[in-house]
Amino acid sequence: MIGRLRGIIIEKQPPLVLIEVGGVGYEVHMPMTCFYELPEAGQEAIVFTHFVVREDAQLLYGFNNKQERTLFKELIKTNGVGPKLALAILSGMSAQQFVNAVEREEVGALVKLPGIGKKTAERLIVEMKDRFKGLHGDLFTPAADLVLTSPASPATDDAEQEAVAALVALGYKPQEASRMVSKIARPDASSETLIREALHAAL
């Protein structure tokens, strides 16, 4: 079981990050809300991970803290919610925002996330509220709900293409992803900024 990685970021391709630890490169899938907080390539990062084994693949999902990982683990216990959908949920809103939406029973906010229909949203609210009660103390601190920033880098057509590809990987249809990015695209925005703003606008 791989629960934590500490190493150098080799490559960032949202929502994937390649981290080298002891000469081995680990490909880690991260929610965009966590991805935004990563340092630049070439710098050291610490990522808390959850290892998922499937018949056709072995996947690592990464988070910036244990609380986000705990929420991910609880999400994938929900009927109809697999790792890919859980990743999309935590990319569309921060962990704290999701907790707030569940506690306030905001079905309307949840159905705006990719892959979440009304029935799934209602099931998430019912099941997750019960699980939150079983967790000791506050699951998240107020700081987890801060607006995150990403390093500014010149945007190009590649930045827009990367943003569209990331949104498709998170569950949006290609045409929908292109429309989302084109609405907020601007010359000075990095791919991470475009992804964050597109997801924010979708809510």
Curated annotation (Swiss-Prot):
BP-aspect Gene Ontology terms: DNA recombination; DNA repair; SOS response
Any one GO CC term of the record: Holliday junction resolvase complex
UniProt cross-references to Pfam families, sorted A to Z: HHH_5 (PF14520), RuvA_C (PF07499), RuvA_N (PF01330)
Keyword Manganese: no
Keyword Methyltransferase appears in the UniProt entry: no
Location(s) in or outside the cell: Cytoplasm
Region called Flexible linker, residue ranges: 143-154
CDD domains recorded: UBA_RuvA_C (cd14332)
Region (Domain II): 65-142
Region annotated Domain III, chain positions: 155-203
GO molecular function: ATP binding; four-way junction DNA binding; four-way junction helicase activity
Keywords, sorted A to Z: Cytoplasm, DNA damage, DNA recombination, DNA repair, DNA-binding, SOS response
SUPFAM superfamilies: DNA helicase RuvA subunit, C-terminal domain (SSF46929), Nucleic acid-binding proteins (SSF50249), RuvA domain 2-like (SSF47781)
InterPro entries per record: DNA_helicase_Holl-junc_RuvA_I, Hlx-hairpin-Hlx_DNA-bd_motif, NA-bd_OB-fold, RuvA, RuvA_2-like, RuvA_C, RuvA_C_sf
Main location: cytoplasm
Region (Domain I): 1-64
Function according to Swiss-Prot or TrEMBL: The RuvA-RuvB-RuvC complex processes Holliday junction (HJ) DNA during genetic recombination and DNA repair, while the RuvA-RuvB complex plays an important role in the rescue of blocked DNA replication forks via replication fork reversal (RFR). RuvA specifically binds to HJ cruciform DNA, conferring on it an open structure. The RuvB hexamer acts as an ATP-dependent pump, pulling dsDNA into and through the RuvAB complex. HJ branch migration allows RuvC to scan DNA until it finds its consensus sequence, where it cleaves and resolves the cruciform DNA.
Cross-referenced HAMAP family: DNA_HJ_migration_RuvA
Family: Belongs to the RuvA family.
NCBIfam families named in the record: ruvA (TIGR00084)
Domain text: Has three domains with a flexible linker between the domains II and III and assumes an 'L' shape. Domain III is highly mobile and contacts RuvB.
Protein name, per record: Holliday junction branch migration complex subunit RuvA
The species this protein was found in: Escherichia fergusonii (strain ATCC 35469 / DSM 13698 / CCUG 18766 / IAM 14443 / JCM 21226 / LMG 7866 / NBRC 102419 / NCTC 12128 / CDC 0568-73)
